[in-house]
Amino acid sequence: MDPNPRAALERQQLRLRERQKFFEDILQPETEFVFPLSHLHLESQRPPIGSISSMEVNVDTLEQVEFIDLADQDGADVFLPCEESSPAPQMSGVDDHPEELSLLVPTSDRTTSRTSSLSSDSSNLRSPNPSDGGGDTPLAQSDEEDGDDGGAEPGPCS
């Protein structure tokens, strides 16, 4: 080994002291270092780690939105309150601007109702038995389908 055991012992003690100092520096926090207050206030403005930006979320939301023309009377009857009097072509002062109104409606509800109406009767345990004569009735009716089911379709107020 080493011809001088004393020098080897001193080098080993020096390495042990350096290791001890290294771990003391890491494990003991320095009291003189303080985070600036601006760092704490910016946390709410930073995007969450690993998430997509809010701009991408807004674009995705807009792609899923369907515009409904409120100038179309059939579509407007669903969203506008009913009047007891006969429908007038224009109320005084309310619709002075003939601009087109539109309403944003998410398409996910319509897609869900179509999916449930197209599902097979065998997969739904509560579906009517085809031998009872109820096999041809849909489970859910979408807004676009016209059905005569006794006033379920919104119409003019009476």
UniProtKB/Swiss-Prot annotation:
GO CC annotation: endoplasmic reticulum; lysosome
Q: Which domain of life is it from?
A: Eukaryota
Q: Positions modified as Phosphothreonine? A: 137
Q: Where is the composition biased (Low complexity)?
A: 106-131
Keywords, sorted A to Z = Phosphoprotein
Q: Where is the composition biased (Acidic residues)?
A: 142-151
Residue ranges crossing the lipid bilayer per the database entry: none
Q: Which GO terms describe its molecular function?
A: ATPase binding
Q: What is this protein called?
A: Dysbindin domain-containing protein 2
Q: Which organism is it from?
A: Mus musculus
